[in-house]
């Protein structure tokens, strides 16, 4: 009896639970269906037409307008309206429309098929206007407006595209393109067909430049046709324009830099030492930024992408090069700091017969530090490097030697080499390379390497790799007597707090600066020295396994109160004094004096073609 009693209670409890679960599931289904139908009903009743915000403008440091907006128009089609017309026996004249648009009937059919393919057009809805043809010109728009009434279901959507006042700065300014499915999933702000920054400043400052789109809420009838504004537009949301950006660029210098790179592969970076503001950042091959706007983008993007000279590579930020003899200045500073040498140290040099690293030419011997920089004496800097690393111990596997190498590496890194700055707004920065001791342990074994093994590092070859922007920044460190402000492109953002001190005492810079001044007055750069201007610089010629050596120069001017630090890299050009040096001097003259007086030199460098594969776009 007792068991039956408990059994009856158990059955009752299970029945109650079952009823509760059924009611719960029923309620969930009701809510789900209601919400789904409500959503469908709302989609049928309203069309939320986007009102695109004007993108922020971009200016150079002197207020010259670089990037602005121009009106463009998209031809939209609502598939349900076309379907209803066909059902009613009154389809539009597609042949006439094709004639107006300048497309074939097959192209018309292909576009319609693409619109209805949800795998490709993942935001497709027959009730929502879809993009049939984008980026119509004002002339096309005016022509269509006259005939659009003949084509129910087709409407015009206003928007803007970028345009450029100067045919330069493609790498640094960047471009905009249609957002991908992944971008839409990642950021709920975007809708299908929106544009966003793809690279450069356009990408870095996308959120500031894009503003906030608005929307116009329109009413539909039962056939999906637009009937007017919802509540007379009281619920519409107006767009908020994007924020304008004033860059640190000097467009006149940028133009000159790009002209001087014509017919060459390479880059030029100029920085204001006191502020870290980038004055110019040119990379070649390049292209007129207007070519990646509107319908031209689909034509030129694959051409640029498939060009063997890699125009999409910004060599200023992403090109990796051995710095060559320009590195000797940093080598001297670090070795002075660590006590491997003093300002009065002299080493003997036997010219091209010197071992294990030969000199490029005969000069006086023994040679002092200033003379070694002026003459670019390889043996001096090899012995400087060797003495610094081996001052506490010698031989493979010696821990004191490795400790000295680690300290040497850290001091080199403090000049902004070997890593990319995380506090910079420059797009596409690369690390470069200054090998760790542990990396050499893996390559040679823990007891398999010493200073002789890595001797090429002493003259900026071997495993030392830098980008041109890092090299220009290193010149700024020397100009500033031991610090740099992170290089940046937005002039309105004060980054003066982003000051980084090099691990070299102020007292060591004078002797190196003197040597760099001698390079430009009496040494490898003297032929192109500027009258009445003290320039401090260093030429470099770096070995290249794929052809002729690269030509490099870095420096700053004037010597007192420097206004510009610069680095020039010309690939496969030969000696640094032949090409990189005169190009740098012309850029310095342009920036400091706002004109170039050496017209013959400018024309010679501008018209000089060192690589016939480089195309002009």
Please tell me what each predicted stretch does:
Residues 1-298, 320, 404-414, 545, ...:
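Periplasmic/cell-envelope proteins involved in peptidoglycan metabolism and beta-lactam response
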Residues 67, 221-226, 230-236, 274-326, ...:
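Beta-lactam-recognizing serine transpeptidase/beta-lactamase-like catalytic domain environment
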């Amino acid at each position: 009896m007792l068991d039956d009693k408990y059994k009856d209670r158990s059955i009752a409890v299970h029945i109650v639970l079952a009823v509760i679960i059924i009611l719960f599931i029923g309620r969930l289904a009701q809510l789900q269906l209601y919400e789904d139908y409500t959503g469908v009903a709302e989609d049928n009743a309203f069309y939320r037409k986007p009102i695109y915000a004007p993108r922020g403008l971009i200016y150079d440091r002197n207020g010259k307008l670089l990037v602005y907006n121009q009106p463009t128009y998209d031809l939209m089609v609502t598939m349900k309206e076309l379907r209803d017309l066909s059902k009613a026996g009154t389809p539009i004249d597609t042949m006439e429309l094709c004639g107006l648009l300048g497309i074939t009937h097959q192209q018309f059919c292909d576009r319609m098929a693409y619109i209805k393919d949800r795998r490709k057009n993942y935001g497709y809805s027959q009730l929502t206007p879809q993009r049939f043809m984008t980026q119509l010109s004002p002339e096309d728009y005016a022509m269509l407006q006259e005939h659009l009434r003949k084509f129910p279901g087709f409407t015009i959507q206003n928007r803007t595209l970028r345009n450029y006042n100067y045919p330069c700065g493609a790498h640094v300014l960047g471009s905009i393109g249609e957002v991908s499915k992944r971008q839409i999933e990642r950021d709920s702000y975007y809708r299908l067909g929106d544009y966003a920054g793809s690279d450069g400043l356009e990408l870095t400052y996308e959120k500031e430049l894009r503003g906030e789109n608005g929307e116009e809420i329109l009413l539909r009838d039962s056939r999906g046709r637009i009937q007017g504004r919802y509540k007379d537009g009281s619920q519409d949301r107006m767009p908020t324009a994007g924020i304008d950006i004033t860059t640190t660029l000097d467009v006149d210098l940028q133009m000159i830099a790009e002209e001087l790179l014509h017919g060459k592969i390479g880059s030029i970076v100029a920085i204001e030492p006191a502020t870290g503001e980038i004055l110019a950042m040119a990379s070649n091959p390049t292209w007129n930024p207007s070519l990646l706007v509107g319908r031209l983008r689909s034509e030129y993007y694959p051409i640029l992408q498939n060009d063997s000279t890699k125009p999409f590579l910004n060599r200023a930020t992403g090109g990796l090069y051995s710095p060559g003899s320009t590195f000797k200045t940093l080598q001297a500073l670090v070795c002075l700091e660590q006590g491997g040498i003093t300002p009065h140290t002299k080493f003997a040099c036997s010219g091209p017969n010197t071992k294990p690293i030969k000199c490029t030419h005969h000069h006086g011997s023994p040679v002092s530090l200033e003379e070694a920089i002026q003459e670019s004496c390889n043996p001096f800097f090899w012995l400087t490097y060797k003495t610094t690393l081996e001052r506490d111990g010698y031989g493979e596997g010696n821990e004191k030697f490795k400790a000295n190498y680690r300290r040497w590496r850290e001091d080199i890194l403090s000049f902004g080499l070997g890593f990319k700055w995380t506090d910079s707004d420059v797009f596409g920065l690369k690390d470069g390379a200054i090998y760790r001791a542990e990396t050499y342990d893996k390559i040679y074994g823990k007891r398999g390497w010493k200073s002789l093994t890595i001797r090429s590092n002493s003259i900026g070859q071997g495993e030392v790799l830098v980008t041109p922007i890092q090299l220009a920044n290193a010149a700024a460190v020397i100009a500033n007597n031991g610090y740099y402000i992170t290089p940046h492109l937005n002039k309105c953002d004060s980054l003066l707090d982003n000051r980084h001190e090099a691990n070299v005492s102020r007292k060591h810079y004078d002797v190196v600066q003197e040597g760099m001044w001698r390079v430009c007055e009496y040494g490898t750069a003297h032929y192109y020295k500027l009258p009445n201007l003290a320039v401090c610089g260093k030429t470099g010629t770096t070995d290249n396994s794929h052809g002729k050596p690269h030509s490099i120069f870095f420096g700053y001017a004037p010597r007192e109160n420097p206004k510009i630090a610069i680095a020039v890299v010309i690939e496969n050009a030969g000696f640094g004094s032949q090409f990189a040096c005169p190009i740098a001097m012309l850029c310095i003259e342009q920036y400091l004096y706002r004109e170039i007086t050496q017209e013959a030199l400018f024309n010679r460098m501008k018209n000089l073609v060192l690589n016939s594969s480089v195309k002009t776009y």
